[in-house]
Curated annotation (Swiss-Prot):
It is found in: Cytoplasm. Pathway: Purine metabolism; IMP biosynthesis via de novo pathway; 5-amino-1-(5-phospho-D-ribosyl)imidazole from N(2)-formyl-N(1)-(5-phospho-D-ribosyl)glycinamide: step 2/2. This is Phosphoribosylformylglycinamidine cyclo-ligase. It catalyses: 2-formamido-N(1)-(5-O-phospho-beta-D-ribosyl)acetamidine + ATP = 5-amino-1-(5-phospho-beta-D-ribosyl)imidazole + ADP + phosphate + H(+). Its main location: cytoplasm. It comes from Streptococcus pneumoniae serotype 4 (strain ATCC BAA-334 / TIGR4). InterPro entries: PurM-like_C_dom, PurM-like_C_sf, PurM-like_N, PurM-like_N_sf, PurM_cligase.
Length: 340
């Protein structure tokens, strides 16, 4: 007679996998939106594009993970916000192209299925989807003993959005004289964490550093990535934005030039950048060169908009938050980003 426990003996707990599915159903239900078809658990997630009302739809997709920020979530045993980070990294990328997020899929790979922990992860994904207006229509949880340690897991996601063909943001509308507006980040977001972990390798995370305004270090390091979708979508609908840059890995230097043509450059006034305390702390404790900080981190600006001068006031009115005029678009001479 075949051994019914053979799979379990190899390290895969099928029953725990079933429990994960049951636990996450209520979180997935929070994300439902018009267009979703079928129930959770099918072989593929379905979405009716006609429900969006877009006349000339162009699908825009993005995929990403959260890098080694996951290692801090595991170290500090805090798993309820890392899913929001994953969603943010994907949807902020596609909103930069003018897309309204429609749906999201996640992938979690782990050494051992721990239903309570994985529920926290997916709850964070669901919260991110709610903030982005995207439905969580599918995903995969893979138990991979031998590939990962029992406490380890990896997380990635995939977002699909839609844009009116006439409202796609591809850099072609950005011109000399456009004003650069910065939207505040919530913190480090989800890049640069290999360096962050090195700087704070000897810290427990419980420390309240004087530079961090009374917060524990671990709270600041795991602050979830801001999702900009609901703030920026109205600007796209009114065609008020010429270019958008999501400031992630590579900081200002790598990401800002992605929103304009090769013959243009961004001239940024550093004094106008709302640098958050964590970045000053990283620079100080890590002895990082000041100019290198702008090559790695968002420095307090998670999303940058290129806007025609005549539209600046309307953009500020719609955003209804602190908006930072940090620079302008100029003709390129040498560098693509000039920080003064």
């Amino acid at each position: 007679m075949a051994n019914k426990n053979a799979y379990a003996q190899s390290g895969v707990d099928v029953e725990a996998g079933y429990e994960v599915v049951e636990r996450i159903k209520k979180h997935v239900a929070r994300t439902e939106r018009a267009g979703v078809m079928g129930a959770l658990g099918g072989f593929g997630g379905m979405f009716d594009l006609s429900k969006t009302g877009v006349k000339e739809p162009v699908l825009i997709s993005g995929t990403d993970g959260v890098g080694t920020k996951l290692m801090l979530a595991i170290k500090y045993d805090k798993h309820d916000t890392i899913g929001q980070d994953c969603v943010a990294m994907c949807v902020n990328d596609i909103i930069a192209a003018g897309a309204e997020p429609l749906y999201f899929l996640d992938y979690v790979a782990t050494g051992k299925n721990e239903p309570a922990k994985l529920e926290q992860v997916v709850a964070g994904v669901a919260e991110g989807c709610v903030q982005a207006g995207a439905a969580l229509i599918g995903g995969e949880t893979a138990e991979m003993p031998g590939m990962y340690g029992e406490d380890d897991y990896d997380l990635a996601g995939f977002a699909v959005g839609v844009a009116e063909k006439s409202q796609i943001i591809d850099g072609s509308k950005v011109v000399e004289g456009d004003v650069l507006l910065g939207l505040a980040s919530s913190g480090i977001h989800s890049n640069g964490y290999s360096l962050v972990r090195r700087v704070f390798a000897d810290y427990t995370g419980e420390e309240v550093l004087p530079e961090l305004e009374g917060k524990k270090l671990k709270e600041v390091l795991l602050e979830p990535t801001r999702i900009y979708v609901k703030a920026v979508l109205p600007l796209i609908k009114e065609e008020l934005v010429n270019g958008i840059a999501h400031i992630t890995g590579g900081g200002f230097i790598e990401n800002v030039p992605r929103m304009f043509a090769d013959d243009l450059a961004a001239e940024i006034d550093e004094s106008k950048v709302p640098v958050l305390p964590i970045f000053k702390t990283l620079e100080k404790y890590g002895q990082i060169k000041h100019e290198e900080m702008f090559e790695i981190f968002n420095m307090g600006v998670g999303l940058m908009l290129a806007v025609s001068p005549e539209n600046v006031e309307r953009v500020k009115e719609l955003l209804d938050e602190a908006v930072y005029e940090i620079g302008r678009i100029v003709k390129k001479e040498n560098e693509s980003v000039i920080i003064k």
